[in-house]
């Protein structure tokens, strides 16, 4: 008899096969960078980053790009950076469609230009003196603000998300992450990460 079963991660085998067949085993992801004008004088008006789907444009690789630009003689960018996301078609779904939890890293949507998996990594530490929770960040883009309203309370470390909520709002180019709820006061610290729904905050 035939029995229907959940494919789980086995579904990735089909997409991987299609990628190997279409792109070939030697395909390498890349990102192109264009300057608005010559950088012989050490300055340019702007840089354009054109993405081609590289999923591993990590912060370490971004620093490598910065060093390479400096080695080319670039010292200043007058009008900032522009990004080109046109290589991929616009997403027809939202990151929260799967389980209504859009900031979870596994819900990150495909993007032609994606830096550091669009993640923000941080550590939560209880502050018994103020009955609040301190947040320290590994890397936080300047256009992202955390509104920390957490308080100390009862709970268990592995299940701290049961009593803490992260919500994202965007106004112009600034994203605010509101953090509310009760953090387990018996936890010495918790390391956590979120993936922002907008993909341009590292540029």
Please name every model-derived segment.
Residues 2-18, 22, 26:
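Short active-site loop at a secondary-structure junction
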Residues 22-203:
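Conserved serine DD-peptidase/penicillin-binding transpeptidase domain
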């Amino acid at each position: 008899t035939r029995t229907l079963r959940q494919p789980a991660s086995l579904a990735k085998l089909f997409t991987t096969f299609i990628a190997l067949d279409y792109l070939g085993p030697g395909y390498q992801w890349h990102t192109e960078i264009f300057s608005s004008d010559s950088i012989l004088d050490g300055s340019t008006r702007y840089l354009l980053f054109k993405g081609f789907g590289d999923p591993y444009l990590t912060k370490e690789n971004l620093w490598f790009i910065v060093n390479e630009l400096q080695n080319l003689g670039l010292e200043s960018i007058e009008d900032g950076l522009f990004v080109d996301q046109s290589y991929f078609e616009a997403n027809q779904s939202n990151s929260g469609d799967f389980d209504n939890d859009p900031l979870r890293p596994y819900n990150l949507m495909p993007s032609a230009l994606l830096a550091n998996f669009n993640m923000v990594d941080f550590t939560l530490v209880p502050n018994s003196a103020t009955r609040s929770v301190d947040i320290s960040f590994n890397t936080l883009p300047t256009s992202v603000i955390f509104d920390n309203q957490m308080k100390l309370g009862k709970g268990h470390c592995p299940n701290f998300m049961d009593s803490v909520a992260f919500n994202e709002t965007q106004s112009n180019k600034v994203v605010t992450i509101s953090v509310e709820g009760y953090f387990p006061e018996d936890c010495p610290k918790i390391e956590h990460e979120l993936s922002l729904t907008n993909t341009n905050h590292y540029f």
